[in-house]
Amino acid sequence: MELIDYIIKILIDKKATDILLLDLRRLSPIADYFLIATANSIPHAQALCDEIELRIKHDLGLLPHHIEGYNPAQWILIDYIDVVVHIFLKEVR
């Protein structure tokens, strides 16, 4: 849960909204958790992604397995294997 708590703190610090944690452990072999948040603009979505990637790498020593959707940034997926972060623009979510 350390990774999840850390990502949630980053999302809150960077003004993401509608943060939702979905526990998928009993539902899907793909990931244990989906963490979903809303950004208010494309630059905001990209800044959230950048900050998560930078701080998790620096503070926890983890790199994402995959990042998808950075451009056009209407829906960015950051895959940390057990935790998958989804950052949506409000109109896409």
Label every PLM stretch briefly.
Residues 33:
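Phosphate-binding and adjacent anionic-ligand microenvironments
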